Swiss-Prot record:
Protein name: NH(3)-dependent NAD(+) synthetase
Matching SUPFAM superfamilies: Adenine nucleotide alpha hydrolases-like
Residues the record lists as binding Mg(2+): 42, 143
Biological role: Catalyzes the ATP-dependent amidation of deamido-NAD to form NAD. Uses ammonia as a nitrogen source.
Source organism (scientific name): Chlorobium phaeovibrioides (strain DSM 265 / 1930) (Prosthecochloris vibrioformis (strain DSM 265))
């Protein structure tokens, strides 16, 4: 199986996701979105979709660098701001992140990365409260399945248009949308520290894991069939473990059911009944 087998009709995907954003924003009673613009492909695609769906005047991009962030990331974020003629703000998170770790021993890169992600979430939700807009998420399907993200950090949002697209499909959609090649072709990175790379952290490429996840989820192939395709068993076992172990990250907090109608389980909110005018 080749990664090209995951390709979609990206014109149709664009139409579906644009309609999704317009409809969900209206259902929630809002008109505009705010998102963190990192300079990476995921946030660039979400920003492009939001502008096409809602108009440039209804999209605010927030750049949130840390002192170790690469200059290239900021340049690529600004490239999207100029391309789309949207409003933007910049909030440096270095001071609050560094202050959090003052006097705390046993610091690790993982913990600092989580605090950075949650500091950015705080900024976005404060802007959301200030301006009366919704926060758009930028986590793709591959990241969500693997749990490669921070709960109540970069995984926090009100709407996420790309959460059902594998990373390889996000790249395909980016090409369709005309996202600058510099953003599509560079190595994926959360830019948490100098030289950090998603694929180095994970130990495999997005193309490799997207094919495996597609076989597991979309094709519903069993272990024996997947291994017969030439997938190494240790790779299969590790990815499966990541998907299973991180299920809790993909759910709202689990509620113990006591009554006949429990929020988030079997009680439908009024907004779900509203007609879209």
């Amino acid at each position: 199986m080749k990664v090209q087998d995951l390709d979609l009709n990206y014109q149709l995907v664009e139409e579906i996701l644009s309609s999704f954003l317009r409809n969900e924003i209206r259902k929630f009673g809002f008109q505009s979105l705010v998102l963190g613009l990192s300079g990476g492909i995921d946030s660039a695609v979400v920003c492009e979709l939001a502008v096409r769906a809602l108009g440039a005047e209804n999209v605010l991009a927030v750049k949130m660098p840390y002192r170790a962030s690469s200059r290239e990331s900021l340049e690529h974020a600004e490239l999207m701001v100029e391309r789309l003629s949207i409003r933007s703000e910049e909030h440096d998170i270095s001071q609050p992140v560094d202050a959090f770790f003052t006097g705390i021993p046993e610091e690790s890169r993982l913990r600092r990365g989580n605090i950075m992600a949650r500091a950015r979430m705080i900024v976005l939700y404060d802007v959301s409260a200030r301006d009366g807009c919704l926060v758009a998420g930028t986590s793709n399907k591959t990241e969500l399945l693997l749990g490669y993200g921070t709960m109540f950090g970069d995984m926090a949002s009100a709407v996420n248009p790309i959460g059902d697209l594998y990373k390889s499909q996000v790249r395909g959609l980016a090409r369709h949308l005309g996202i600058p090649a510099a953003l599509i072709d560079k190595a994926p990175s959360a830019d948490l520290w100098q030289g950090q790379s998603d694929e180095a952290d994970l130990g495999f490429t997005y193309e490799e894991v997207d094919i495996l996840l597609y076989q597991m989820l979309e094709l519903r192939m069993d272990k024996e069939s997947i291994l017969a395709e030439g997938v190494p068993e240790p790779f299969y076992a590790r990815v499966r473990q990541m998907v299973v172990r991180n299920q809790y990250k993909r759910l709202m907090p689990v509620i113990a059911k006591i009554s006949g109608r429990t929020p988030g389980i079997d009680f439908r909110y009024a907004r779900d009944w509203q007609e879209i005018s």
